[in-house]
Amino acid sequence: MNYFSHYCEALLLYSMFRSLLYKLLTFLIFLLFVGNISTVSSESVFDWKYSAFDKYNTGFSPQTVISKDNVKNLELNWIYQFDSVEPLDDDIVPPEGIQTTPLIYQGIVYVATGYNEVYAIDAMDGSPLWSFKPDINDFKNTEVWAKRLAMRSLTIHEDAVYVQTSECSIYGLDLITGDVVFELPETCSNIPGNNGEYFSPFAPTFYNNLLITRAQGNAFGGRGYVSAYDLETKELVWHWFSSPPAGGELNWGYDEAKLGNILPFENDWGYTNYIAGGTSWGLVAIDEESETLFLLTGEPANQFDAALRPGPNLFSSSIVALDINSGTLKWYYQMSTHDINNNDPGWKVVYTTISVNDVDRKAIIAASKSNYLYVVDALTGDLIHKPIHFGPESYNLTNENTENQSDMYASQTKYVGEIFCPSQLGGVFAGMSVADNVAYIPSQNVCGTVLTRQLEYKGEVIDGYVYRLDLDRPTNGSIYAIDLSTSELKWQITIPDRIQSASLIVSADVLYSIDRSGIFYAIDIEDGTILNSIPFNSMGSAGPSIGADAKGSMMVVFPMGGGTLTGNNPGILVSMSVDESSESSYDYLLFAITLVSLIYATIVTRRRIKN
């Protein structure tokens, strides 16, 4: 009778604490990985708290429930359909669609739509919990930001999720209620030396008492900058500028040039009022130990003749390291000198530790739109490997890794009626993922060209230039796996459509990708074998995330919908998972634990009877 009683008790415990044991075992398995993965964050394996999982932007989740062994069995949990919105008061119809990787935190999914809206959705059943919808008709400069309305990131900090709206106002929203608990309005107003316009698709970043933000505006003549504010007082702590003020600045960057790979150049950028660009885009990374902020800067404004901005144009198209407390430049590495091809870095910078010649080195990993991977020492900015080229041979690019031997007076007029490859959108546009000393990089195979036309720029009509994709030739996408220890290519695959803005992620030996046509791919990280592919027949413009609902059940969540880049339909949010009860090897582990518990209980009972 005692044995039967113990057996029943063990089965009851198994049933009651199954979910808890799932979590415990996942955490224990995660601990086993600590010595083997290149970067280990303190983030919960059940949450996806940042756009690329952690503040280092690795895009790697250590969960093991959804794995290479069962990803082929992914099943639909739920779909959330976003509503379309009305045109603005002045009949401007901005594009729709979603470019924001969803966040998953404590059983709630957070996502932003193109219209500056933030939604909180129950991860268990896809039911809406709350939404934040600012009145975008009240925004200033509607004719500017409405062309670039898409949100590209959210950030969770303490008890709030943060969004930066298109006109650069930052809101902190209570995670549970959606109430506004923090507001910092129009952070891109009154930027010194600026005579252009901005829009702001990226959420702020946090470090101690600092809120760090920036805005984009290369196409609208905005001056590149990064700002830090005191979270308590909301006062500006520092500005850092990546380009000189409109009209130029004598000896711009002359003294700071020694901190990077470019020699000082007199009269860099020249002295025209058209000067602009180098705005920081993509995700930034933070190293708390050295208190360093790592970021990427975009190309110089290319709406006017590049010959009017002579020089390397520091600090555009660069990897940049700043002292996070003061905004002081620590080092920079310029990828594309005097950039006229828009060969600036892709979606994000990654901070990680890699092993090179059996020595661990802190490294910054970034890729350019020209299909080069840069592996840079995080402390010094020096190259660990020479720039690593991947993909097809480039065609007709200017100043391709030529640094100080670049043509400092080149003009984009050479591309009028001609093509160059990769295009101004890449190559690499979407974000890579880094896991266990390997970088997984998405690229699109498409060429670009330049047209001349009159356009409005900085409040006047100029004879300017616009960049366009060459879609008369076949296009497709590729994914490359590069060993960061050796710089060697491990494998590559080609898929039918381009990977334009959906970042890659890695988890449990599976690489996840979504192409423009809306095909969801699960790929074996060892050899590039496609383990699963699911067509959704709608624009894929944002990457997936992996996290758990309130019961601890793991799921993959991703948005779909849009047209070209942002799109013309509001989109959906998709949740998929595997049947943990039948597919997961945890059941065998749990049974083993139950059996051990039963044996232990029997032994204890015998000892008590004997005593």
Annotate each predicted stretch with a short phrase.
Residues 580-592:
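Juxtamembrane/start-of-transmembrane alpha-helix segments at the extracytoplasmic/lumenal side
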